[in-house]
Amino acid sequence: MTKIKIVVIVGPTAVGKTALGISLAKAFNGEIISGDSQQVYRQLDIGTAKATQEEQEAAVHHLTDIREVTESYSAYDFVQDAQKAISDIVSRGKLPIIVGGTGLYLQSLLEGYHLGGQVDQEAVKAYRNELEQLDDHDLYERLQVNNITIEQVNRRRAIRALELAQFADELENAETAYEPLIIGLNDDRQVIYDRINQRVDRMLENGLLEEAKWLYEHYPTVQASRGIGYKELFPYFVGEMTLAEASDQLKQNTRRFAKRQLTWFRNRMAVSFTAITAPDYPQVVHDRVRDFLGQKEKS
């Protein structure tokens, strides 16, 4: 079976994945697939760091604005949607470029979690429904029985982990349809932290507070509201924090999230990282993609 070549850009939040994705899309006739669990939601643009209108005009983006904030979204959903997007992009002779920071989503796609021929999807759905009926105590016991330890346990993450454990044998035997070039972006910790702090400041200047307040007033308990970028501002709305304190909390949580992202990518994916402050950074990445695609450099 000839595998489909795809480019996957990973790295901590605020490192510049979107900008690189657009640059590669322009250079290699590509289209971008968002691999971010929060960017699927309509009306949540600023806090999710969704590509701006100008950026979306520069390159076609898929899997953004495909769910209402009241809807849930899982790794299983992402894999099904990403499969369809990849097939569509390839059918038009273009290069799929996945840009994302949700490690479980990317791993599920790249390691065969999506293959209906190998994994009984009806069994997956039935098992998920069974888990969703459990209360938190019973769900936690299931994690212990399966020797699963996950950081910051919540129901959504616990169910995902149990699904992967339950169908591990099928997943190990599944053959992915894709040949990925995984490009990792990173830099010194302080460089990343400074970029995060600056981006949070820009988000607040551009209307994040209003976006978060709308979510808090209308849908404070939905899955989308639990994402970093919104829940940190909720205490400000009820007078439990000053805006400065809430902003600092958001920056701190985002920095911690970036650290967890890097840990995930280093431990779970075969990725070589490139420093974004290296003088030859853009050219090095473009050369890697060109070699991957078997193209010659234009004179």
UniProtKB/Swiss-Prot annotation:
Work out whether the entry's keyword set contains Magnesium.
yes
Q: What is its EC number?
A: 2.5.1.75
Q: Name one GO molecular function term.
A: ATP binding
What does it catalyze? adenosine(37) in tRNA + dimethylallyl diphosphate = N(6)-dimethylallyladenosine(37) in tRNA + diphosphate
Q: Provide the binding site for substrate.
A: 13-18
Q: Which GO terms describe its biological process?
A: tRNA modification
- List the InterPro entries hit by this protein, alphabetically: Dimethylallyltransferase, IPT, P-loop_NTPase
Going by the record, the broad EC class of this enzyme is transferase
Q: Which UniProt keywords apply?
A: ATP-binding, Magnesium, Nucleotide-binding, Transferase, tRNA processing
Q: Would the keyword Metal-binding turn up in this protein's UniProt record?
A: no
Q: Which cofactor does it need?
A: Mg(2+)
Question: By its UniProt entry, which Pfam families does this protein fall under?
Answer: IPPT
Which segments carry the region annotation Interaction with substrate tRNA? Answer: 36-39
Site feature (Interaction with substrate tRNA) residues? 102, 128
Positions annotated to bind ATP: 11-18
Q: Which family would the database say this protein is a member of?
A: Belongs to the IPP transferase family.
Instruction: Summarize the subunit comment.
Output: Monomer.
**What is known about what this protein does?**
Catalyzes the transfer of a dimethylallyl group onto the adenine at position 37 in tRNAs that read codons beginning with uridine, leading to the formation of N6-(dimethylallyl)adenosine (i(6)A).
Query: What name appears for this protein in its UniProt entry?
Result: tRNA dimethylallyltransferase
Gene name?
A: miaA
